UniProtKB/Swiss-Prot annotation:
GO terms for biological process: biosynthetic process. SUPFAM superfamilies: Nucleotide-diphospho-sugar transferases. This is Uncharacterized glycosyltransferase RF_0543. The keyword Lipid metabolism does not apply. Keywords: Glycosyltransferase, Transferase. CDD domains: Glyco_tranf_GTA_type. Belongs to the glycosyltransferase 2 family. Its EC number is 2.4.-.-. The keyword Metal-binding does not apply. GO terms for molecular function: hexosyltransferase activity. It comes from the Bacteria.
Amino acid sequence: MITKKDKPLNIYCPLVSIIIPVYNGANYMREAIDSALAQTYENIEIVVVNDGSKDNGETENVALSYGDKIRYFHKENGGCGSALNYGIKNMKGEYFSWLSHDDIYYPNKIEHQVNILNKLDNKDTIIYGGYELIDEKGSSLRYIKPDSVLPINKLNISLLPLLRGLIHGCSLLIPAKYFHEIGIFNEALPTTQDYDLWFKILRVAPIHFDESILIKSRFHSEQGSKKISNHNEECNVLWSSFLHELTEEEMIKMEDSPYLFLTRTATFLSNNTPYKKACDLANTMAKQVLHDTKVSVIIPVYNRINWAIEAIESVLIQTHKNFEILIIDDGSTDDISELTSICKKDKRIRYFHKKNEGPAAARNLGIKNAIGKYIAFLDSDDLFYKDKIEIQLKFMEENNFIFSHTSYQKINEKGKYIESVHSGFFSGNVFPQIIQTCPIAMPTVMGTLTLFQENLFPENIRSGEDCCLWISIASKNSIGGIDKELSKVRISGGTNTFMDPNKYSVGLINITSYVLNDPYLSKFSPFTINLLLAAVTQLRLLENKDYKKSNISFFNNNYVIQKIQTYCFVTKILILLTITSIRQEGIRATISRIQRWLRKHI
């Protein structure tokens, strides 16, 4: 027990005022007052405010029976808020602790909370916790534990526990300074005056959750809110005002994004309250947040203008209308007049021209000029489904992902269906497995602008540069996957990795080199072994007689074709040599050997 006499010089021992408002409460108030008097912390005062009780003096007689053990005040009836305000105006303490006349404090309620304050640097912190629910006779019903609903870190975000119904007013220990700075209870609100004031105070005050149960809250039929007919309407108005007053920054602090805050608030209101109007408002505001979210679509273009126009058109018909298109012309040599004409006609399209440096540099230029909250990538020969952005945006906002991808469909040069690729299953914490298997296709990707501003594409790599970036991002973040086809990837000759074993092999080798040269990623170098083996295996495709008949520009020289056929037999033993090299000389030496072989022979 801490007493004023025993107070050590280095122990914070402030005067705490316990305010007990009461109206016709003779049936329960003695238990409440006794629990206040039984506090193990002695530096307290007990202020009882009789709010004009009309019970033939029964309430007053109970209060007067305590003599000078309490400070007793009588006033005209004005409601609970007015009684609390009267107590606040007459309290002498540095801290306020509310005790309803029908509730009970555990003996250590005040001492325990003051002990917490002693451990905190900021003595202006509000302390709160859970409570025990009891019935009319005082029998325990259950324990209400906020930490079973939200993690501790969330419970210490000032407004969030209030807006999830987790704060009981009698569990609070509040510095009196906030009544002077923020104000007192709104007496015009018969049943919501507490939440109204807590909302105002908690917008500026820090809070600290403590898991100890320190109060007993009585549930009975005579409680004021149950007897006031317009209670639900008053609550609807109050909650609606909360939603309108909260800033974007406050919503982000509570739930990481305005959309998440609004949808989770709507869910809370729907599941736990009858406040339908406030719930509908939260849902409406959430939809508006999505509508107002701009997505930047980056399309690098190098020749093949007709396909680029098709790609642009697939964006223009999106069901989500708030987007911009950044066309990055990577030094095209074809006639681009039709493309530039389309760009000039739509203010949502911005055109950039640069010298040819490869798709990585083109995408990076787009990232540096994007203004959307999210970025989506679309290669100029690929297509979006019309609801691609809408579905992916909602998925990311709902699940708080900063990076996501989807399943997709392969099409041929004429746009005809080839097959579906269900890559969207690849999600969650996929690192380091993503090093050896990365199924993420470029036009399926969407991420936050901030993410890509901090993680640009490696411009020194022209094949496999996308996978290198996905690996880097996955090493630090969870990946969101949607197993729904939302993009079409065109499979064509010449420039497409799917059709070019050599390009695919070089891409795998580039990825391996990227991993090995990164200080962090290189710790997971064993995962690159399969990449090397896959690269060598792909070279076997060069033995295919039909391959030399393809229109792939790399092989349009007969001399090169003859060189390939001459050295193709090497691939039959190259896998075994690679395995031996890895075992004896390591991955770095092996990758260098393969790169030299490719440069020399292919």
